[in-house]
């Protein structure tokens, strides 16, 4: 992956001199800054065959370095060992992203692979599993291997995998019959099928559908944790822990000895089958006879580079002090033990002693070792031009006069062309991509790429310029291909029922789901869904009627009242809701008609300026953004006024879509009003528009409290005269005193946050102006159906490419953690949201934090402040006048502070899932990694739902996947916003799904649209045979319900075959009860196509009844021929004008019934409908 830059560097004498000693002797290299240093390191790696390690000060520096190295080295060869501060990593439940990267790195090292390894100081000093033990737990399975299954499953547990009944998350495995499913930390989920002890087949499978996707010949299974814990390790840990407990007990206050005993006993309880790696990792110091560090994993000839030695040394001193304090606190509070360390205490340079080390520092500094050589480079930063044409031209001409080669990095082909035409106008000799031939100096080469900054190497006569210097755009992070978590943790349908969930039975009302039970009725076994109603009432619903039962979903965490079986209460409730839904449908139909009649302005196709404007956008659009822009432009180009809702998660790029629509309107001489709910948002949107429109003659103005009376007056005059093209503002824009010369587009941000009066004004504008509404609250898809034609909808569900998943930690509240998280964010010049949801003591909380962080500026924001103070506080935070803001949930919506990338939430267990998700959306909104710490009180036993909630938010670190979880809670909120507050009560009384269904039916009925066929026509099959899914075959109730649902929907033999394949694929060969169930389904398929309505078992016979239509469509002659093999066991008659076929139950009568129903199907006269 050679690049033009490294070609130039490779020919340089200074570099060649360094190359000679790099990795062979102790060397000091000075003078190189960020990107230039990365270039030198990359070139060394590309010119050698060895492993190369770079030690950085912290994870932030490691990330920066990685971004630059990706420009030169294939991403498959770069390995980062991401370590946060050690205590947070060891004491919290955390998201799997970092863990998978660490495991990938250790595995590559254990297999002695060549690579470029980046390790922050914390990772270098951390205690690890001994190398040999790690190597012995890397599993490779091939088809045909003979293995001891028990030993294999034990190894998985040692490696950190958890045994579950169904595999749905990373780090889980399950055993069903002879099938083992595993979801490794790296790679796809795999299904291994055994024939006795032989590996019969290995298949990839999809966790969402649980179906296999294709056969593979072998699979490598990496560990699911960065520690291996075998039974021997567990014994050794308990033994060492006992010693540590006995050493610690006499040295602490008597008052906390009980606490220490509890801590000790909770660890001693762990058994090999059920221990939790996440908890036991705290005892790493007691685990191994000889713990390793990452340096033990490197080959002897590895090349070592240290980035800014003095800075690392400083960090190390602080780190050791902090950990000492932290451990002291733990010991004094009875939560920790003497000698319970997490890292190697000696200076980090001792770990590097066996190797020759190259130290990079910007300035000359004293080193801890005897240096063999000092090599000085001279490197200058490139001036920031930020689009200032004249400065750029004079600087570029200086380079040309001095015979420099200028390498300009552009991130896309379009940008390359744009930069080329710009340089041509400056008369600079320009080439595009000439990697192989060395140009003479005095010219520019434009090539695709991206670095964090440009640099000038005067003695090489080389300068590298990036888009950052040219246009102020940020470096786009190259996505790394080996991230395995993309869409891996998709949420299963929210309809998954768990015992104890509330459900709605269409005819009986709200009950509670108690599970699936197999009952014997009249000597026959069948599965039933058991529901609890008011008092002791219970209802058993046969699984073939399960479509009448839906999960109850309503406002978050709200428990409904159970209905009484057989009472009138449910009927009354449904009647009320029906009436409300009818009225709602009338209103929607009226809106639809009015909209179809109204006439607006028809915009023309895109102009050349539009194209230029769109090319200027520094990032790639996501597919959803492109689609939304396309839909909006199509709306604008027709006569009917646009009324489109653009729905997308926080920070997913809705603003850019709106800005492009605004530009299109202005290009045709129309004015645009951008209406937002708060002054701060107005300010932020205004700044975005100013920045995006700066190269075009477009007048953007703002009307808000932050403007003087004179400025507001001038803006109003400008709107009236047509001088102002775009105005941004709060509800003031809707005032009667605002007159537009020619308003063509109204953009409304978060319409639901405006009052009734303002909404009415917006509605009146909709009659002849194009309206685009933006919202971050997901709107339920079920409601899209009923709203169809009333309002158009665009959805952005994919995140922008260079946003990282927010690293999420769930941990007990602890002052040390908090201090550390604050210090780390402030040390990278970032800001922190500290969420404390108790207004009465919020100022005390600020004082506590001020004592922890005396040098930080800390602000407070809460909903009881007056609006002006609140806005000014938030604005100060946005402008970085505060480092930390202690706030209530008021930050949940709308404020965009890209520089705030740490969120700490106290008492996170008290929040609902959607709230936690939306709050977490406040951070990780730039190209930096965001961190969210969800704290819960120490010693508090979390309720099961709180635990589930925190677990869910932790697992769904993948961007946009939280959108899927929160969908449930937010949908209801969205439904209320869309349909009006008064509908909320009705949604809660019957549950969200039944409400949506009723509304859709009402709207369709009024529009004369026939409801689509939801399920197969009902055929009653009553046969006295055991036909069900036994618990021994499918132990997991959720999986059982899922299969029953699929069986209910079967309408063809192909679908039946598909379910048969799935059963064998997931659960292995099926028993006789399942075989009979599938035979009944086959009978149902044939009967369905033959117009059969009922198949009934009556003693020694089975009766088959046809519908009137089925009777008339049967060709009697064909049927007679087809059924001859059945002979006298079959009789055909007619009852009330409908055919009735009687079959004697002799021999294998179930096969005869299959044959009969198939013959009936084949004897049908083909008509258009069944």
UniProtKB/Swiss-Prot annotation:
The gene is mfd. A motif (DEEQ box) lies at residues 749-752. In the N-terminal section; belongs to the UvrB family. In the C-terminal section; belongs to the helicase family. RecG subfamily. It comes from Staphylococcus saprophyticus subsp. saprophyticus (strain ATCC 15305 / DSM 20229 / NCIMB 8711 / NCTC 7292 / S-41). This is Transcription-repair-coupling factor. Gene3D superfamilies: 2.40.10.170, 3.40.50.11180, P-loop containing nucleotide triphosphate hydrolases (3.40.50.300), Penicillin-binding protein 1b domain (3.30.2060.10), Transcription-repair-coupling factor, D7 domain (3.90.1150.50). PROSITE patterns: HELICASE_ATP_BIND_1 (PS51192), HELICASE_CTER (PS51194). Residues 810-971 form the Helicase C-terminal domain. It is found in: Cytoplasm.
